[in-house]
Amino acid sequence: MEKVGGKPPQSRLCFLATLCAMFWVLIFYFHFFVIANEPGSAGADTAAGAAASIARAELPLPEPERVSDPAVPLPPPALVSEPPPTTATVAKVEDEEKPTAVAHQEAAPRDYAFQRALKTAENKSDPCGGRYIYVHELPPRFNDDMLRECERLSLWTNMCKFMSNEGLGPPLGNEEGVFSNTGWYATNQFMVDVIFRNRMKQYECLTKDSSIAAAVFVPFYAGFDVARYLWGHNISTRDAASLDLIDWLRKRPEWNVMGGRDHFLVGGRIAWDFRRLTDEESDWGNKLLFMPAAKNMSMLVVESSPWNANDFAIPYPTYFHPAKDADVLLWQDRMRSLERPWLFSFAGAPRPDDPKSIRSQLIDQCRTSSVCKLLECDLGESKCHSPSAIMNMFQNSLFCLQPQGDSYTRRSAFDSMLAGCIPVFFHPGSAYVQYTWHLPKNYTRYSVFIPEDGVRKGNVSIEDRLKSIHPDMVKKMREEVISLIPRVIYADPRSKLETLKDAFDVSVEAIINKVTQLRRDIIEDHEDKDFVEENSWKYDLLEEGQRTIGPHEWDPFFSKPKDKGGDSTNPSTNAAKNSWKNEQRGQN
């Protein structure tokens, strides 16, 4: 059979079918595995992906985190601000680049210069964490030079003798056996400036690094400064040292951290000596506490203003300054064991020039009572000038009457508590709104309150009121008073109590807590924008965590006019002037 040239028809058909199948396989492969994976693909799916990539690129890109160079110190201002973020631009995405997904980023938290100090409290291995104090090294004109001229510090008293023993004064004899064997001194009631500074020198958590300080102490003798120029000097002289101090502080980097709000100082006098409202030469005191920069600082005084927020009351110094815990514990045990034959007692003089004073009524009631002991004080020689006579009377009394002095407060209140005598107050400004750091806010635990208006009108019998208190309650109150003794005395500045906190320790702890809370409020933006300064006394009575105030039962006591124009006849000015008369009497 003759062969036909070329491939048979059946083979050609098979070849064409195979070629066609391979063609479509290549088409599908090219479409799904090559084109779909190319960045520039024009397919529907790839076009949507490209649109999404461009949309993401148009979002603002986050600024990369800044890593602070640890070798570069923080600048002085409290707020270390970041530069504004740069605006992101849409750039062409090259084939080798992958589109970056950008998430929404919140504004970075502010960085404050005091945050390092806050973090020290988190170091549990550091016993001083959160407790460091930085002390300014002031030029001697602000402190030591005043002591060298101690004879000029008071018009009525030579203060030089009280400078001995680190400000405690000369030791007291114990011929009558009223005191314990050690720790008793003839301490002047206005010596807190020196005592506090010398105690600070022994503070266990001092630091030279202000960036870790929980607070900053300014060792300016504000009380001595105002004392030396009050009589016979013009206002320029009275204000000079305070203005000089503020100028010096404001040039310091430590001041710029919080504008002075972490600074504190001590003025061992009543607040009214530092609150001159006008520049009239006849006006009283200096204006330290009204200077704008000084208002940022906290000032510790023996009597604060109920209507101002930058001064805080600390106890008057007593005669007892123990060197060790055992001295305190032995004294407390002795006060518990005493027999007290007198129901109540009073040491003081009448105030005939003050129509609102109830002292004359108290003296009259004491004279007519068979269960009251009276020490009448006036100019000249008096047992009121004898620490042993005063302490002996208090030790033999269950209750000690503590009306207002020439101002709200009296040193006598702390002398009586030191003797284990339950204080009887007649005005909340004498203790309850003053010493809120050192005394319980529930005043009924340690004292009796008899509103002075009832005494003034003759409607209240002190004897009957005190006799109505059950003996078991009296015993409980006396124990509370005795337990408070460490908190209302200043230990010997040359030593330190080990387990007990004295008035210095309580004050420093309170200042640290105040500054720490303020710093946290600044960071969290929780500062109280509704704070009313003239109601400061109400805020001091709030419990921890409370911020809201309202009407109070003591409003009538603090509603009297406040310093209208700062004239010399206003109540606070008169109180300050009259307090100086007590330096002539020798007894407040």
UniProtKB/Swiss-Prot annotation:
Q: Kindly list any coiled-coil regions of this protein.
A: none
What are the annotated GO cellular component locations? Answer: Golgi cisterna membrane
Q: Which InterPro entries match?
A: Exostosin, Exostosin_GT47
Q: Does the keyword Transmembrane apply?
A: yes
- Span-the-membrane segments of this chain are 15-35
Q: List, as start-end ranges, the regions of compositional bias called Basic and acidic residues.
A: 549-566
Biological process annotations from GO: protein glycosylation
Which ranges of this chain reside in the Lumenal compartment per its record? 36-588
What function is annotated for this protein?
Involved in the attachment of the Gal residue on the third xylosyl unit within the XXXG core structure of xyloglucan, the principal glycan that interlaces the cellulose microfibrils in plant cell wall. Interacts with actin and is required for the proper endomembrane organization and for the cell elongation.
Entry protein name: Xyloglucan galactosyltransferase KATAMARI1 homolog
